[in-house]
């Protein structure tokens, strides 16, 4: 099973850069890169909420479950 992170898709839809998102969310570029490259083991609800607020989306718009 895998969780797919679609931050790049939402960034493109919102015409927003990774740098701009990191600034709005209040996390480092390194941490945002770990998340968007699907290397993160977990995400805080507060971070997920901030990303959704910045991208004006729902958690399901950026996180997707795919079975093996």
Give, region by region, the residue ranges found by the protein language model.
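A short, Lys/Arg-rich alpha-helix, primarily the initiator
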Residues: 1-16
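Residues within the helices of the helix-turn-helix
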Residues: 8, 19, 49
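Short alpha-helical DNA-recognition segment
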Residues: 16-34
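Short, basic-rich loop-to-helix N-cap that marks the start of a DNA-contacting helix
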Residues: 39-50
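Short C-terminal boundary/hinge segments that cap the last helix of small helical domains
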Residues: 56-68
């Amino acid at each position: 099973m895998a969780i797919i992170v679609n931050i790049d898709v939402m960034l493109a839809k919102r015409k927003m850069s990774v740098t701009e998102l990191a600034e709005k969310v209040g996390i480092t570029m390194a941490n945002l890169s770990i998340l968007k490259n699907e290397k993160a083991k977990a995400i805080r609800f507060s971070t997920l909420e901030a990303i959704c607020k910045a991208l004006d989306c729902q958690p399901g718009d950026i996180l997707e479950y795919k079975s093996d």
